[in-house]
Structures are given as structure tokens and as C-alpha cells.
Amino acid sequence: MKRTGFIVLIVVGLATAAATASGHETATPNAARCGGTLWRLKTLSDIGRRRVRLTPEVTTIGDIGKRASPRLVPRVRRTHFQRQAWKVVGQVTQYRLENGGLRLVLYDAGSYLNAVIPLPSCLSAKTRARPQIAAVWKQFVGACTHPTSSWQPLGAIVDIGGIGFWGQKRTIKGAAPNGAELHPVTDIRIVAGC
């Protein structure tokens, strides 16, 4: 009886090691490794995910940057911007891997906007549009390059869609001044440049 239990333990251990070695993530998504306390909003895994309209509204990076932002960063989806998918065309000026995803800096006609593609390992079973988000990651990384934690220039032109997200208001170059982002990115078409 003890021998059977030992054999089962070894088989389970080998299966876990094989899954880890093959690149499959075995850890459960969490705030510590997937973008902080708002990771559920950032991955479309939050309680309000079903209220998001996934059919994108076409707009511009500049128009998103002009939207009135909430006084505090919302912890739940309470604004129209957060309950809508948006589609813009822009140039990816640079990108980098950061906690929980791949941050793209988009530029068009003098305006900037950040868009974030979550790491596939940060998508939970509750993530809405999970296959689409994972496909965006695969397409961008497969077509462009392998991301690192350092900023990398790119110059690719993309038609990109994502869910509205309010982050911290930033005064740095490359971010929308009102804190608006597309997070998560749910669709991407690389027009040129990768």
C-alpha cells in the first residue's frame, strides 16, 4: 500500500516537472505577479467583465487622451470608458515586458496611449475573451520579437483594440495625460513594421 502511494507521488511529481519544463505555467494568477491589486480589471477577470461591450468603438488615440478621467483610479468598472472595447490605429514606438504583461507605447498625431497585452499565465479561468487575448500575445511576440524588461524601439503600425482602463495620471512621455489605457488588448493587426 505504501509502495503504491509512493509511485503515485513520483508520477505526479514527474507530470508537474514535465509541465513546467514544457513552458506551461502551473501557478495561479495573482496580484503579486500579474499587475497589482487591479489585475482582475487588467485581465478582464473582474466581477463586472460581463458588462463590457466587446464590439469595439473606433476612435483615435487623441480622443481617448481627451476623455475626462475619474478623480481616483476606479477599482471596479463604473465608467463608460471601462465598459467598452475601443479600436485605434497607431505606431508602436516602444514596448517592454513588465509585471503582468507587455506594455506598448502607441503614438498618433501628437498623442500617446499605453496598451497592455497581459501575460497568458495571468489570464484566469474567469477571463472574458481569454482566447482572443492569448492570441494577441502569440501574434505580437511571434511577429515582432521576444520582449525583455528594457524598453525596445519598434516603429510598427498597428490596428489595435482593447478595453478601456483608468490608470494613474502620468506626465511622462508615452502615456495619456488622463491615465487612460487599453488594458487588456483584445485584438491586434500588424499593418507594417515587424
PLM region spans:
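C-terminal region of N-terminal signal peptides and the immediate post-cleavage residues
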Residues: 15-27
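Bacterial N-terminal signal peptides that target proteins for export
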Residues: 1-7
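OB-fold and OB-like single-stranded nucleic-acid-recognition modules
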Residues: 24-194
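Bacterial N-terminal signal peptides
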Residues: 7-16
